[in-house]
Amino acid sequence: MDHQMKNLLERLFVRDQHVCPWWCCFTFDNFLRKLFHNPEKILRPYILKGSTVLDIGPGMGYFSIPLARMVGETGKVIAADVQPEMLRALWMRAKKAGVEHQMITHLCKTDSLGLNTQVDFVLAFWMVHEVPNPFLFFKEIRSLLQLSGKFLLSEPILHVNQAMFEKTVKTAESCGLTLMEKP
């Protein structure tokens, strides 16, 4: 394998910390994804009307927009990302879907969410492997969750193997989060 191809494969699949570029997320939001990651099936058990939900690293709204429908007119979805382009694309999609009144976009710092709103549910789908300091990240999540709040963590198997995921879960537990269930 030539050197350039090896570098590309390492960049795409090796388990390092990098932020998925905004322009790449168009490939994630397609009709096939719903076969594997159906937002309604995955999230409905945890979301009540009127809830305040935090979607961290929301991409272009694949989960945020269905979450906004689930929380209803009295609920809120805070979509937090480090890339302004991602948040702009999400906002346009939220307007097109008619859920902009439930949606709050929030630009994070690379080392902090920068939020102080208490939330009922936090979603971190395929993004914790991009976080520079998972310990501080989980501490911040714990501080934002209501006492009865829930946190759903999912990582991509191509970037995070089982041992790495178990380490991530242990880090989350060391920050006061409790493992409730696994798929």
Where in the sequence are the language-model features?
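N-terminal, positively charged/glycine-rich alpha-helical extensions of SAM-dependent methyltransferases
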Residues: M1-W22
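Class I SAM-dependent methyltransferase SAM/SAH-binding core
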Residues: L54, M60-S112
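A short SAM/SAH-binding and catalytic strip from SAM-dependent methyltransferases
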Residues: D120-P132
